[in-house]
Each structure stands twice: as structure tokens, then as C-alpha cells.
């Protein structure tokens, strides 16, 4: 929890500084979608006309019914989801003449509001719940913390099932999944400023299970309707994923041992030298002895990035007394602030050790259990019988490492204006939102409100539901005004708006040297999006609210988009493997190109460019 708190507070502090970049990126995505829709819409009309013998000339002039000789025929278009929401203050003509800009600004404001609620209120309350339930790091990350980052997509899916009765929710889930895999990895690779070596186990574990989830989703939506047992299967699959995360360390140790055994041609023993049982990965459990003697492992490779998970979990070192004290102080027996400081201390110590190793200065164990060049300032004693040998072998003294960077806890406050001019403008722009949230939601990150974390959880959930409804409503109006189908708006604009904050946060984490954690978490969060983000709304509709009913999938092209999603996962993992499990600029450009190709093909499929897939959206003269 301490390391997660360190990362989250750093993300919250820096994400607000990147608000212009986030707004610019989302606006650029909307502009590209408008251009692509205008281009592919004209191409798709010819295919649709040839395939269905549509009588009308253009899609924009379609009516809800196409009567011939006064006899109404079946609809030759798809009902827009805009009619499921309250009537807009502006007519369609007024929106086309400029009023749609107000809706775009409102949607951007809702994106930012969701990011603020999730980061500053919802996620801290989830952390408190995990602490009270004494959940392990892996189980908490797979359940509550995954819900914290994917709540906007979940509520968008709920609104799509129960309110719009359309595909905007499914489109948002699919688009967000592709965005998380391709765009976030690409941005981290381009702008991290360093080469990040990825851990094969985390990527393979989440990618394999995510591939299974996508295959199941394709099988379920292929017939364009969802029945009760299909939603139940998705939920059960997520329960199995939680079990996998619960026994993650044991599985990682098992497969890592098998891999080393195959690579070396001989079996690898994990037995402890003091006669204990097999070392099954329990070294990450704070309850095990911290000063036990274990067999030597090969030294870490020379890399500018500290693999925190790998260092603290996969390769147990010989702990000295100060190091063991730090390990003890990150357990649940100590307060959150103490654990946060000790976790940052461990990270800096390990990074300094890698830097010393890269410079040719090795930390050698001494007979008295101390290490040379230790951060605690201990100096080894030379052998008095051979002073010259001691002088030759003793490396030059190293300066003490810098103190851990203090992570200043930043709380939202509508009553403190920042000093910088740019920050003042953003503060004025977001002041109504900050004031509303601070008045209605107790901030359980503050000590005085810490015991009210359940109140924070409930009120934050209500605000997320309200903001998600407004977000989907505004995006639906924008799509109807610009002639963009709901599925495309979900795959592109909604997905980008709900995922760009996570993208910026992952970039911040990657710049701090924790890119491996950021990449593996993006893939793992997609499992939650598919299995829970779709399984819960579908299950509620077909088993609770209206038992025996079905959920209709209106867009046939959505099946092809999910197939493209499956292909993007396979190509991404293949690219990571061919790049020798390194995240750099070359891999970043590769996955961003894949994301652009996915968007182009998804838009072309929805507009019937290749073959007839969907009826166009119904238009009205207003």
C-alpha cells in the first residue's frame, strides 16, 4: 500500500499540471474522427446502397420511416440514442451553427470532473477499504484498485444498457481497452526519456487472460444479443482472475523456476541454505524471517530503470540489519506515512546499488554481515595482516545517496489560489467543480475525515454516476450533430476522454523509472473493463431487472472491432517480444501506428466501406 500511495500522490500532483495537454489530445481525437467520418461516410454510402438497395440519396436526409404510397415500411436506419435523454436546449440547426462547441466544452469538463473524483476521493476511499479488509497487494489491485481506474467506463456501460439501449457503452469499453494497450504504451515509450525493461511474467499473465476474455466476448456478441448466462460467465471469469492474482507470487516463482531450469539445462533448486522448505515466493510476505540466508542469485543487469516489483519480490537479497528494518516498517503494523517513507527509502537504496554496480563498484558482503558502500554509512575494516591488499581492493568512497524525495500531500481546496499565472487560470476554470466536491464529499485522505471513508466511497460513487450520465449525454449530442454513430463516439472520443488521465499518470510513473509497473497495470485493468464493465450491466439486466430478457447489440461492426482488439493485443505482445522486452521509442512508434490503424479500420467498418454492416443513423429535420 505504501508504494501505491507514493505513486498515486505523485500522479495526482503532476496530472493537474498537464491539463492543457489532456484537453488538446482529446480535441485532436475528436477532430480526426470528424474528418474520417466525413471521408468514409461518403464511401460507405455506395456500399450500403448496393447492398441494401437504399432508396434515399444521402444518409443525412434519412427519416425514421420510409413510407411508400402511404404504407409505412420497416426502418431503414438506426434510431439515435439522443432520444433517450432529455431534450437539448438547442435545436440541431443551432448546434450545427456553433452551439455544439458548448457541448464539447461540457464533455471535456466532465472528463476532468471524473478524473478529480476518482483520484482525490474515490481511490483513497478504496485504499482505506483494502486496509480494513487486510487484502494483499495483488488481490486489492485486481479488485478495488482496478475499479478505481475503470469506474467511468463501467458507468458508461451501465448507461448504455439501461438508458440509451445502444452500443455506446460497449464501444467505450472496447475503445478504452485499445487505448490502454496501444496508446498508453506508445506514449510511455516515446516520452519516458529512458529505456524501460519489461517483466515478462506480468505482461504474459495479463495478456493471456485478457486474450481469453476477448475471445469469450467475441463468441457472446457474435449473434448480436446477450442472454443471462453469458453475463454470468463474464463475472465468473473475473472471479478466477482474482484467484490468479491471489496466488500470483507462487505461480511466478513456479514458472520462473521452470524457465531457468530449461534455459540452463539442469534443475534449479530453490531450497534455503538453512534447511527450510522450498522458497515459494513468500519472501514478499512481511511475516517471513527477513535475515535468513538464501542462495546467491545472479546480479541484476545494468539498466537505468529500477524494477521495483522484480527487485522487491522476484530476487530476495541478503538483508542487512538496516535493510531488514526498512522491510519491517513497510508492513501493515505501521502507519501509512511511515510505510510511504520507508518504501521510498528502499527504492532509492536499490537504485543507488544499481548505479554503483554499473560504475564498477560492487557491494560485497563482509564477514560481520555488513556491505561495502552501504547507504547507512558503515565503512568496512581493512585486513591488518595485508594492508596493501586492502588498499587495492577497497573502492573509492561513494557520496551518500540523496534523501528520498518528499511526496507532498496535495489536497483539493477551493480557498487557496496558486501563485503561477497558468495555475491561476486552471484554478478559476475548475473552481466550481472543486468547490462542489469539497463541500459534498469528505476527503478521507485527511486525518480528521479518515474514519468516514465509507461516506467518501458512497458520495464519490454517486458523483461518478452523475458525471458519467452527463458525459454520455453530451457525447451523444455531439455525435448526432456531427453525424457520427454512437459506436464510433464510444470507441474514440469517450474512450480517449476517460482514459487520457490514466495515460498521463502512466507517463508520469514511467518518467520516475516505474514504467514496467505502468505497462502491466494498463493491460491488467482491461480485464476489469471487459469482464466487469460488461458482465455486471448485462447480468443485472438479464437476471435481476428483467429475468430472461436479452441485451441487443445494435452494431454488427462492433464484432469486427473486437476482433481488431484481439489482433492488437497479439501484435503488441509480439512487438514487445521482438524488441527484447524493452519499452523504448521504437516500440512506442510501433504501437501508436497500430492504434491509428485500429481507429481507421473501425470507422471504415461502421460506415460500411468494406461490406454492408450497419444501417445508418436516423436523421430528422430540426
Curated annotation (Swiss-Prot):
Keyword Zinc: no
Main subcellular location of this protein, as a coarse class: membrane
GO biological process: amelogenesis; calcium ion export across plasma membrane; calcium ion homeostasis; calcium ion import across plasma membrane; cellular response to high light intensity; cone photoresponse recovery; detection of chemical stimulus involved in sensory perception of smell; drinking behavior
UniProt keywords, alphabetically: Antiport, Calcium, Calcium transport, Cell membrane, Cytoplasm, Glycoprotein, Ion transport, Membrane, Olfaction, Potassium, Potassium transport, Repeat, Sensory transduction, Signal, Sodium, Sodium transport, Symport, Transmembrane, Transmembrane helix, Transport
Residues the record marks as carrying a glycan: 76
Summary of the knockout phenotype: Mice have a reduced ability to locate an odorous source and lower body weights. The olfactory sensory neurons display defects in response termination and adaptation but have unchanged sensitivity. Mice show severe enamel defects.
Topological domain spans for side Extracellular: 39-97, 164-172, 222-224, 479, 548-557, 608-622
Topology Cytoplasmic: residue spans: 119-142, 194-200, 246-457, 501-526, 579-586
Pfam families listed in its UniProt record: Na_Ca_ex
Any one GO molecular-function label of the UniProt entry: calcium-dependent protein binding
Mapped Alpha- repeat ranges: 139-179, 495-526
Subcellular location: Cell membrane; Cytoplasm
Record InterPro entries: K/Na/Ca-exchanger (IPR004481), NaCa_Exmemb (IPR004837), NCX_ion-bd_dom_sf (IPR044880)
Tissue: Expressed in late secretory-stage and maturation-stage ameloblasts, with significantly increased expression during the late stages of amelogenesis (at protein level). Widely expressed in most regions of the brain, including hippocampus, neocortex, thalamus, striatum and olfactory bulb. Expressed in the olfactory sensory neurons.
Membrane topology according to the record: Multi-pass membrane protein
Described function: Calcium, potassium:sodium antiporter that transports 1 Ca(2+) and 1 K(+) in exchange for 4 Na(+). Controls the rapid response termination and proper regulation of adaptation in olfactory sensory neurons (OSNs) which subsequently influences how odor information is encoded and perceived. May play a role in calcium transport during amelogenesis.
Homology family: Belongs to the Ca(2+):cation antiporter (CaCA) (TC 2.A.19) family. SLC24A subfamily.
Protein name (database record): Sodium/potassium/calcium exchanger 4
Organism: Mus musculus
Gene name of the record: Slc24a4
Amino acid at each position: 500500500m505504501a508504494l501505491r500511495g507514493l505513486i498515486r500522490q505523485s500522479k495526482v500532483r503532476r496530472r493537474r499540471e498537464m491539463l492543457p495537454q489532456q484537453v488538446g489530445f482529446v480535441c485532436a481525437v475528436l477532430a480526426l474522427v470528424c474528418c474520417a467520418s466525413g471521408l468514409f461516410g461518403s464511401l460507405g454510402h455506395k456500399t450500403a446502397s448496393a447492398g441494401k438497395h437504399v432508396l434515399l440519396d444521402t444518409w443525412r436526409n434519412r427519416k425514421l420511416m420510409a413510407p411508400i404510397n402511404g404504407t409505412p415500411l420497416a426502418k431503414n436506419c438506426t434510431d439515435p440514442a439522443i432520444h433517450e435523454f432529455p431534450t437539448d436546449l438547442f435545436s440541431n440547426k443551432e448546434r450545427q451553427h456553433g452551439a455544439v462547441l458548448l457541448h464539447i466544452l461540457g464533455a471535456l469538463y466532465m472528463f476532468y470532473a471524473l478524473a478529480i473524483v476518482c483520484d482525490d476521493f474515490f481511490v483513497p476511499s478504496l485504499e482505506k477499504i483494502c486496509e480494513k479488509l487486510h487484502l494483499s497487494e495483488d488481490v486489492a489491485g485486481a479488485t478495488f484498485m482496478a475499479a478505481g481506474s475503470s469506474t467511468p467506463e463501467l458507468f458508461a456501460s451501465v448507461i448504455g444498457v439501461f438508458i440509451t439501449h445502444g452500443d455506446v457503452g460497449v464501444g467505450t469499453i472496447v475503445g478504452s481497452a485499445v487505448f490502454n494497450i496501444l496508446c498508453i504504451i506508445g506514449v510511455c515509450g516515446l516520452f519516458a526519456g529512458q529505456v524501460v525493461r519489461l517483466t515478462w511474467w506480468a505482461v504474459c499473465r495479463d495478456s493471456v487472460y485478457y486474450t481469453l476474455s476477448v475471445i469469450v466476448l467475441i463468441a457472446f456478441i457474435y449473434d448480436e444479443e446477450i442472454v443471462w448466462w453469458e453475463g454470468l460467465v463474464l463475472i465468473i471469469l473475473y472471479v478466477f482472475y482474482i484467484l490468479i492474482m491471489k496466488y500470483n507470487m507462487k505461480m511466478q516463482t513456479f514458472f520462473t523456476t521452470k524457465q531457468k531450469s530449461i534455459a540452463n539445462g539442469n534443475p534449479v533448486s530453490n531450497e534455503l541454505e538453512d534447511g527450510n522448505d522450498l522458497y515459494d515466493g513468500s519472501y514478499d510476505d512481511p511475516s517471513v524471517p527477513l535475515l535468513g540466508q538464501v542462495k546467491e542469485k545472479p546480479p541484476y543487469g545494468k539498466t537505468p530503470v529500477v524494477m521495483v516489483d522484480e527487485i522487491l519480490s522476484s530476487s530476495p537479497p541478503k538483508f542487512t540489519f538496516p535493510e531488514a528494518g526498512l522491510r519491517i516498517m513497510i508492513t501493515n503494523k505501521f502507519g501509512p506515512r511511515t510505510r510511504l517513507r520507508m518504501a521510498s527509502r528502499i527504492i532509492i537504496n536499490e537504485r543507488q546499488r544499481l548505479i554503483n554496480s554499473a560504475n564498477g563498484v560492487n557491494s560485497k558482503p563482509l564477514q560481520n554481515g555488513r556491505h561495502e558502500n552501504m547507504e547507512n554509512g558503515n565503512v568496512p575494516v581493512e585486513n591488518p595482516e595485508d594492508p596493501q591488499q586492502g588498499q587495492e581492493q577497497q573502492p573509492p568512497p561513494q557520496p551518500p545517496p540523496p534523501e528520498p524525495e518528499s511526496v507532498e500531500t496535495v489536497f483539493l481546496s477551493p480557498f487557496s489560489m496558486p501563485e503561477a499565472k497558468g495555475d491561476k487560470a486552471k484554478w478559476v476554470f475548475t473552481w466550481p467543480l472543486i468547490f462542489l466536491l469539497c463541500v459534498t464529499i469528505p476527503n478521507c485522505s485527511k486525518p480528521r475525515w479518515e474514519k468516514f471513508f465509507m461516506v467518501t466511497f458512497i458520495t464519490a460513487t454517486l458523483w461518478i454516476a452523475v458525471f458519467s450520465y452527463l458525459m454520455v449525454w453530451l457525447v451523444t449530442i455531439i455525435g448526432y450533430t456531427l453525424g457520427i454513430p454512437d459506436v464510433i463516439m464510444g470507441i474514440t472520443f469517450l474512450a480517449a476522454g476517460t482514459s487520457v488521465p490514466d495515460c498521463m499518470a502512466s507517463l508520469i510513473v514511467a518518467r520516475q523509472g516505474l514504467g514496467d509497473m505502468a505497462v502491466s497495470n494498463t493491460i491488467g485493468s482491461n480485464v476489469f473493463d471487459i469482464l466487469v464493465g460488461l458482465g455486471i450491466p448485462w447480468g443485472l439486466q438479464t437476471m435481476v431487472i428483467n429475468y430472461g430478457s436479452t441485451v441487443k447489440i445494435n452494431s454488427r461492426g462492433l464484432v469486427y472491432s473486437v476482433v481488431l482488439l484481439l489482433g492488437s493485443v497479439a501484435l503488441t505482445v509480439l512487438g514487445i517480444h521482438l524488441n527484447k522486452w524493452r519499452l523504448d521509442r521504437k516500440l512506442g512508434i510501433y504501437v501508436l501506428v497500430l492504434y491509428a490503424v485500429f481507429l481507421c479500420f473501425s470507422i471504415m467498418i461502421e460506415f460500411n466501406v468494406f461490406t454492408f454492416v450497419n444501417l445508418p443513423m436516423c436523421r430528422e429535420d430540426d
